[in-house]
Amino acid sequence: MGAAASIQTTVNTLSERISSKLEQEANASAQTKCDIEIGNFYIRQNHGCNLTVKNMCSADADAQLDAVLSAATETYSGLTPEQKAYVPAMFTAALNIQTSVNTVVRDFENYVKQTCNSSAVVDNKLKIQNVIIDECYGAPGSPTNLEFINTGSSKGNCAIKALMQLTTKATTQIAPRQVAGTGVQFYMIVIGVIILAALFMYYAKRMLFTSTNDKIKLILANKENVHWTTYMDTFFRTSPMVIATTDIQN
């Protein structure tokens, strides 16, 4: 679902819409006595996630289910194309559902209605229920804050749990990539600094610390290359002195 920061934004938006839909469509309220309480919430592998439980209970379990699905649909519709592209993989990993960007809403609705209307869920009369999530990751430098909304019914809580499984699965896919990406960027920066430092030292040595052999080479390289005809010109530039034989005899 895009960057890890977008996950937190999506979580917040989803929670707000669920609360609003439950209030509007299922007459839920934070003051209503809940028939079911959340006893414990387990995250088997928690890597930086915080959790709070919020009660929004009512007596209409079917309306709760519809409200949760409506909130999920609206939230998905508000995602960017890049974020939507992540969702099918999240469905497969979290709920074992094969889906696509175009059918994800319908497939999720079918999954929730089949699962949450099953006898195993409907006949669960436990007044205190526990919720178990496999794993959750926080974004680099900041935790992911989750909110489980207790609807007060097994049906409603079943739908909420399905959404939370998707959300936490998204954190396991995005946050580790960001950590890995941060590490790669760090090493690339370090390597770049080392290369620049090596180049600086090389040129500094050439400029400030020149050996005797290098100095000789530089002098010879800068010395003018004199052509052989120049030496002949120099030799014949002054007329030779003529000595008479009489002078020698005397």
From Swiss-Prot:
Keywords linked to the UniProt accession: Disulfide bond, Host-virus interaction, Late protein, Lipoprotein, Membrane, Myristate, Transmembrane, Transmembrane helix, Viral attachment to host cell, Viral envelope protein, Viral penetration into host cytoplasm, Virion, Virus entry into host cell
Domain of life: Viruses
Intrachain S-S bonds: 34-57, 49-136, 116-158
Cellular localisation: Virion membrane
A cellular component term, taken from the record's GO annotations: viral envelope
Residue spans, topological domain Intravirion: 205-250
BP terms from Gene Ontology: symbiont entry into host cell; virion attachment to host cell
UniProt-annotated stretches for the region Targeting to MV membrane: 2-12
Family, similarity comment: Belongs to the orthopoxvirus OPG095 family.
Assembly with partners or alone: Component of the entry fusion complex (EFC) composed of OPG053, OPG076, OPG086, OPG094, OPG095, OPG099, OPG107, OPG143, OPG104, OPG147 and OPG155. Except for OPG095 and OPG053, each of the EFC proteins is required for assembly or stability of the complex.
Protein name: Entry-fusion complex associated protein OPG095
Taxonomic classification: Viruses, Varidnaviria, Bamfordvirae, Nucleocytoviricota, Pokkesviricetes
Gene: OPG099
